[in-house]
Amino acid sequence: MFSKNKHNTKFIVIACVIVVLILILFCLDFQNIQEIIETINQLTNNQNPSQNTASEMSGMRRKIIFFIFNFFGKIILASFVISFLLHIKKNAQIKRLKNKLSLWSKLSFHVSQIGEEVLNELPIGIVLIDISSQEIQWLNPYASFILKNPEINSPLAQINENMAQLISTSDAIPKTIITLENKKFECFYKKDLNVFYLFDATEKEQIKHLFLQKTLALAMITFDNLAESLIRYDLSEQSQIQGEYLSALSDYIEPYEGYLKQLIDDRFLLLLNRQNLDKMLENKFIILDTIRNISYKYQLKVTLSMGIACWNLSYEKLATYSQNAIELAQKRGGDQVVVNIENEKIKYFGAKIASLSKQSKVHARINAQNLVDILKKHPHCFIMGHTHTDLDALGSVIAFYKIATTIHPESNNYIILDEEKLDKSLIPVYNQLIKTEAKTSLNIITTQQASKMIKDNSLIAVLDTQTKDMVNSPELLSLTSNVVVVDHHRATEEIIPSIFSYVESSASSTVELLVEVMGFLEKEVHITAFEASIMYAGILIDTNAFIYRTSSRTFEVASKLKDLGADAIEVKSWLRKDFDKVLEINKLISEMEIFMDRFAIIQSSEIYENRSFLAQVAEGVLNIRNVDAAFMIAQIADNKIAISARSYNEINVQTIMEQMEGGGHLNSAATQLEGTNIKTVTDTLKHFLKLEYEKGEKNMEIILLTDIPNKGKKHEIIKVNNGYGNFLIQNKKALLADKTNLAAIKQSQMLEQEQKRNHELLMHKLKQEIDDKKITLDIQLGPKGKIYGKITLKQIAEEFLKVHNITLDRKKISLEGEIIAIGIYPVDVFLTDQIKATFFLNVTERKSK
């Protein structure tokens, strides 16, 4: 289109030039034209034409013919000039085009050569596949070399599974790192061309790994309950016990080359790098067991908690992350380590005993006062528990509603409950509540109603959970920033942001915390007998009939609820099982699997919509001797599988469930998983149980850092007993043979071999420069031709440097014997054990002047 418009423009310009030229010629010949016209007029106006002589007519014809020839001659001449100029211009354009074509031809040749070199010579692997069959169609020589010469039409999955997985990824530019014979390759997949590109990234990954290993980790360490536990001892005993704790902590840190600084009596700061942190992770922080054993020895309730952050951030932010981690560890009950590593999910270690209660009456009173102050500022309160509301959640919701109503009797406070979100076992109790407690039931609203009523200054109370995903109505949390949380579960990293949080993981239930708060209010809280029964049932369920997480304060709260009219018989009737359920539980238990001689795993392909039934099965299995933990696995809906876990004190099912995207308490926890099946979930559960509880061997594998007589050489991997192995590790004579250290030693050996090869090449080159060279030393001779003094190796080295500008180590120079006379002597230079160079020394007599 552009070319056509350009051609039309040229034509118009030329036509305009011709028209202008004709007009100019007319102007130039205007006088001649005027004369011809006058002559014609005279001849025409002559009344007697016969009088027009032949000569006049002939003259007129000559003028006209001359004018025509003159006029058109000029036009032809001008056209010729224009054509000539256009011809020159066109030839110039043709010449330029020929030059461009020649240049393009040369460039095309070079580009073709470069492309061929890229395909065949440069270290870039290129693999072309058939997308339908996922088979290799073509690959360049470098790709063939690194992939070990695969045959054409070979399935890609057989050659490298990681490459095959890139085909189905949804990333815009799928890429991954693959390992091929100790080398790392960056692999890119270009979807539109069905081509893989492989680049050697070994050095890049090594640098990245080294940088990662040197990343700073900051840890906050606290001894839980130390001051409270030591208060009954005298000063000397306190110093002795505290010294034993500190000594154990110091001994634990020493092999990891960390910097330990005591901040106050029970709080410490630890600095170390990522490499040593990984070793701690592999050993699962055995310091927790050591501190627990010391506490058991003195009958103390002292444990250790650590919060570790390892991020490539400023020190200030890193310290904040570490502080958040230690706070999370303490919210979860202490006796554990919380590790927050960049780009990794938060890890939890320890927590093998129930949470130690730090709560005192003073602590409860302070929290009660803070809660009252907040409620006074916000007269309109919306209260909700967790989804799949059960008796413990309902009891805590009612308890908080009663507290809010007591503080603001004239205001409307609301309980948010959706019938479709209730646990099926709760529906009969809920229906009875609606009938029995008319005043309370009037203020029960749905999520949809609440969304229209909540304002910016409204208050939302979240009870019996801290996790946004577990809340009955998570969408309501965005309607106001005024949120309070009261819970007794161990915290996770995904806690709900709040203006006030009262979390006590050592409490039996949220009901226990709220009933204690009632005792510190200025006004008496009016609770009906039926409401007290619901709260009592909540405690009963959370403690499994006062077995787990039960303290004297739990019984105080239960006693108070009994005084308020709680009916234990009615509660028992709510918790009774149907006959069909009992048969189903017994059937499932009869088919259970005992794993690792201590864990019961029950599976069912049936769909159980009632989640509490799964918990009942797990709790029933715990009554069997030698079962330390029970896991009930079943479908609760299409494409959704749940695990209900129960255990005794020594097994922490919470940490197991957290690794499977769940949570809970030390002895009762659960999770829900989507997009999987029973077998996969069971295999995953067994994997985590093995990692956590499988007993290690009495011997350990270590990597020697120096030669040990009768044991092995440097970098050798040997197996020794744990005691001797730990001794060598603490004295920095060995490293634990874990994946990190093995990789580091392998990398060190590869580096040493590379350096050795480079050194040998350098020595061979130096040998070539030294061989057959000659130097001369002029020596003064005695009367009988003997040499005065002695020719030293230092003299030889200095003379060689002077003559040939090569520095020799005189310790590596060797002579066959002592030089005692003039002559030519061979001199050997031992560059390495296997490389020897030889030059010649000419000893001559010094001429006297």
From Swiss-Prot:
Unknown: annotated segments: 1-680
Keyword annotations: Cell membrane, Membrane, Ribonucleoprotein, Ribosomal protein, RNA-binding, rRNA-binding, Transmembrane, Transmembrane helix
Subcellular location: Cell membrane
One of the protein's GO biological processes: translation
Region of interest: Large ribosomal subunit protein bL9: 681-849
Signal peptide: none
Gene3D superfamilies attached to this UniProt entry: 3.10.310.30, inorganic pyrophosphatase (n-terminal core), PAS domain, Ribosomal protein L9, C-terminal domain, Ribosomal protein L9, N-terminal domain
Cellular component aspect of the GO annotation: plasma membrane; ribonucleoprotein complex; ribosome
Note: The large N-terminal domain has 2 potential transmembrane regions and a GGDEF domain.
Job description of the protein: Binds to the 23S rRNA.
Protein name, UniProt field: Membrane protein-large ribosomal subunit bL9 fusion protein
